[in-house]
Amino acid sequence: MLKPLFGKADKTPADVVKNLRDALLVIDRHGTNTSERKVEKAIEETAKMLALAKTFIYGSDANEPNNEQVTQLAQEVYNANVLPMLIKHLHKFEFECKKDVASVFNNLLRRQIGTRSPTVEYLAARPEILITLLLGYEQPDIALTCGSMLREAVRHEHLARIVLYSEYFQRFFVFVQSDVFDIATDAFSTFKDLMTKHKNMCAEYLDNNYDRFFGQYSALTNSENYVTRRQSLKLLGELLLDRHNFSTMNKYITSPENLKTVMELLRDKRRNIQYEAFHVFKIFVANPNKPRPITDILTRNRDKLVEFLTAFHNDRTNDEQFNDEKAYLIKQIQELRV
């Protein structure tokens, strides 16, 4: 007698995960030839089991999710170690199946038992899974799916720390400049989360890795890619103005080279670049303890800067904060003396 193929009642979470693991093992052994019938069937079975797993987690039109079954499913997923296999073979799945992988992964990450987050603990013990997700940005067909899972993971500080302090973190400086707009944007979103979500951890990272980080970051603010340049300038302003990054800000705004770069960006032909550069430039000028090299540059260019700023974005008549800041900068620069 043939078993029913569908129906939540027909399979337990243990059945679903066992079938999923068996299918993934076939792909593991024979996956180099995805046109081989046994691999095709295994990929189909993977998609089918993932859809059932998703039904356990999210429920269906007819049934609400059952917490006991969700807990059982999660435990079976951990015990069977199917998450690394799903991510390893993600590029072989159809679009809907990839989405289901991300849905299941992200939901499991959000699960808590009291103060514990079992999936966070599971991933923390297997950092290679996080690195595989990060390197997913190198493959256009899975980049966005991997990005969504990685962003969900780095919401948890312990997992974010693993990624941030990994040697592979530096790859973000390449990914955010991808020629593929969607990949570059997605990678920057993940990069920004890594640098801003966990304030104390990020401040510590920037303090300990200042030269390396900003040596690479300067390539982003000078990128030929408009979106990369604008996003990186905006993030730079946010990082420098965050009180947690006070020591990093002090170091950054005492560099004459940084000031020269920002002054050049103020004159960029694109208005949005000018505007973001303004919000970095103002930190240099507002610093009450400007070192002599910074004061010298501002003083040497005093008249030109006053003239430039007086005419700068005068159409922003409704932006009261911007106009107040601009007036303050003009006053500060006018008061500089040789």
From Swiss-Prot:
Taxonomy of the source species: Eukaryota, Metazoa, Ecdysozoa, Nematoda, Chromadorea
PANTHER family, per database record: CALCIUM-BINDING PROTEIN 39-RELATED, MO25-LIKE PROTEIN 2
Known role: Regulates asymmetric cell division in Q.p neuroblast lineage. Plays a role in cell shedding during embryogenesis.
Entry annotated with the keyword Cytoplasm: yes
Predominant place of localization: cytoplasm
Phenotype on disruption: RNAi-mediated knockdown results in the production of additional AVM/PVM neuronal precursors.
Keywords for this protein: Cytoplasm, Cytoskeleton
Gene Ontology biological-process annotations: asymmetric neuroblast division; intracellular signal transduction
Species: Caenorhabditis elegans
Family of the protein in this entry: Belongs to the Mo25 family.
Pfam families to which the protein is assigned, alphabetical: Mo25 (PF08569)
Locations listed in the record: Cytoplasm, Cytoskeleton, Spindle pole
GO terms for MF: protein serine/threonine kinase activator activity
Protein name listed in UniProt: MO25-like protein 2
A GO-annotated cellular component: spindle pole
Cytoplasm is among the record's keywords: yes
